[in-house]
């Protein structure tokens, strides 16, 4: 069984993330969505909320693709998480050259730690290249319309959290 790991903070999950997840399901039999517990980032949504939103959105994808999608929180090194879930490949999304520079360094470090686990990059579709969770939160916080960047469920959660009812 081919197992892939798509890691991220997903605070919140965006249409860009969902697009990468959908496309990653074409490459593996089981896709683990690794939700990073990154206390330094000070997430808007706690871990349970992020996991719930991801599970809700991925349930639809599982039905459409037939690929098993599992959500797995982690706080350890990414390469250790990959080992823990039995992943042979780490999936990363790229939006721009700036993403590549960071990801290139990460691949080098991960390969030094375990060269049996590959990393593959999926380029964001053009319509999703500008989407970043940080920007979505800022737009929502300032009262802007984020419907082009997130699902209705996530838009509703953002409005609730930021008191925009």
From Swiss-Prot:
InterPro entries recorded: Cyt_trans-like, PPAT, Rossmann-like_a/b/a_fold
Ubl conjugation keyword on record: no
Chain positions recorded as substrate binding sites: 9, 41, 78, 92
Cofactor field: Mg(2+)
Gene that specifies this protein: coaD
Residues engaged in binding ATP: 9-10, 17, 93-95, 103, 128-134
Annotated site residues (Transition state stabilizer) in this chain: 17
The UniProt record lists the keyword Transferase: yes
Subcellular locations according to the entry: Cytoplasm
Quaternary structure note: Homohexamer.
Membership in a protein family: Belongs to the bacterial CoaD family.
Protein name: Phosphopantetheine adenylyltransferase
Functional note: Reversibly transfers an adenylyl group from ATP to 4'-phosphopantetheine, yielding dephospho-CoA (dPCoA) and pyrophosphate.
GO biological process, one term: coenzyme A biosynthetic process
Source organism of the structure: Ruegeria sp. (strain TM1040)
Keywords attached to this entry: ATP-binding, Coenzyme A biosynthesis, Cytoplasm, Magnesium, Nucleotide-binding, Nucleotidyltransferase, Transferase
Record field: catalytic activity: (R)-4'-phosphopantetheine + ATP + H(+) = 3'-dephospho-CoA + diphosphate
One annotated GO molecular function: ATP binding
């Amino acid at each position: 069984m081919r197992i892939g790991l798509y890691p991220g903070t997903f605070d919140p999950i965006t249409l860009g993330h969902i697009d990468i997840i959908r496309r990653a399901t074409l490459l593996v039999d089981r896709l683990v969505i690794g939700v990073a517990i990154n206390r330094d980032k000070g997430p808007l949504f706690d871990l349970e909320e992020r996991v719930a939103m991801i599970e809700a959105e991925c349930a639809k994808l599982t039905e459409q693709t037939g690929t098993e999608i599992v959500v797995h929180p982690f706080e350890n090194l990414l390469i250790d998480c990959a080992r823990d879930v039995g992943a042979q490949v780490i999936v990363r999304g790229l939006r721009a050259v700036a993403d590549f520079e960071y990801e290139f360094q990460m691949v080098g470090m991960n390969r030094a730690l375990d060269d049996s686990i590959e990393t593959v990059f999926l380029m964001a579709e053009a319509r999703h290249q500008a989407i970043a969770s940080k920007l979505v939160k800022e737009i929502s916080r300032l009262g802007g319309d984020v419907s082009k960047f997130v699902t209705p469920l996530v838009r509703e959660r953002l409005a609730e959290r930021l008191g925009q009812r």
